[in-house]
Amino acid sequence: MRVSDFTFELPDELIARYPQEQRSGCRLLSLDGPTGARQHGVFTDIVDKLNPGDLLVFNNTRVIPARLFGRKASGGKVEVLVERVLDRTRVLAHVRASKAPKPGAGLLLGDNEDIRATMLARHDALFELGFDDPRDVLTILNAAGHMPLPPYIDRPDEEADRELYQTVYSSRPGAVAAPTAGLHFDQPLLDRLRDKGVEMAFVTLHVGAGTFQPVRVESIEDHVMHSEYAEVPQEVVDAVLACKARGNRVIAVGTTSVRSLESAAAANKQALIAPFFDDTQIFIYPGYHYQVIDALITNFHLPESTLIMLVSAFAGYRHTLDAYRDAVVQQYRFFSYGDAMYITRNPQAEQEQVVSA
């Protein structure tokens, strides 16, 4: 399969720069995986699509204000994007500068350039930085960092993004990108789902900046997925197994929940799923056999991205690309702050031949 098989034309004006005023007020395109039938509605329709006893699995990661601006102590502007917090004083980060800092180089960060950090080591594309500050890293970032909006939201971050670019249930700081399907759930909608008898469970996957990296190979089989840390605790495993046993469906909220659950299944050979606390590089594309999830709630993804490949593996390649082209015609809003899809699994998807239109 070629990366170019997963392209589609997207007018720039359909890229959402700001979210809807009301979280659950976005549009919802429902795609029936087996038939490819499509339905247009609003996100709160999700209540009618789920049954009592179904299980929604959310990602409870919380986005950290991971972007810092400043300069090298030797001169020259620098931009730091924290990829992973290692401990109270150290991080792994992407560093943009006219000349990459060498080990031992000092950085002066923050709007007032009063936060001191030292480049300790380089690990491929990432820099290990140590902060010389009495505060821990998360406190520093919360005080001085900027929200790391995706590159296609081509505007500076604003104070409002600190809450708007978070799910209402986020509780585990560590992500540099939001699990955006969850942005559409507000508390009244969650209450309605609970009142209906829909069950809920929470995994953690700290989304890294690699989620925005383009696929730089022609054949998708040659792509090496970025690594992200995921946790699927015992209570999630129990909830999934109980849901399956009673004949209900597991619905993943977002591709990060998909990757967490499927990683936990892939790592365990004795049962459907087992607890998982590890880095994952799972890459899901057409031909993949889904083991856990029955339905998926997700936003509209970038052309040629690993995420549209994941959706194609779930709903079927042709059904997915047809739905995306229809969404463009219907003027849906795309990407992180955009509209959503509800997709049921197409059991024939893994046998489908990918032939671009």
Swiss-Prot record:
GO biological processes: queuosine biosynthetic process; tRNA wobble guanine modification
Compartment annotation: Cytoplasm
Keyword annotations from UniProtKB, A to Z: Cytoplasm, Queuosine biosynthesis, S-adenosyl-L-methionine, Transferase
Entry's Gene Ontology cellular component terms: cytoplasm
Catalytic activity: 7-aminomethyl-7-carbaguanosine(34) in tRNA + S-adenosyl-L-methionine = epoxyqueuosine(34) in tRNA + adenine + L-methionine + 2 H(+)
Membrane among keywords: no
EC identifiers of the protein: 2.4.99.17
Top-rank EC class of the record's enzyme: transferase
Residues in coiled coil: none
Pathway the protein takes part in: tRNA modification; tRNA-queuosine biosynthesis
One Pfam family matching this protein: Queuosine_synth
GO molecular function, one term: S-adenosylmethionine:tRNA ribosyltransferase-isomerase activity
Protein family per UniProt: Belongs to the QueA family.
Oligomeric form and interacting partners: Monomer.
Family matches, as PANTHER family: S-ADENOSYLMETHIONINE:TRNA RIBOSYLTRANSFERASE-ISOMERASE
NCBIfam families assigned to the protein according to its UniProt record, in alphabetical order: PRK00147.1, queA
Task of the protein: Transfers and isomerizes the ribose moiety from AdoMet to the 7-aminomethyl group of 7-deazaguanine (preQ1-tRNA) to give epoxyqueuosine (oQ-tRNA).
Name of protein: S-adenosylmethionine:tRNA ribosyltransferase-isomerase
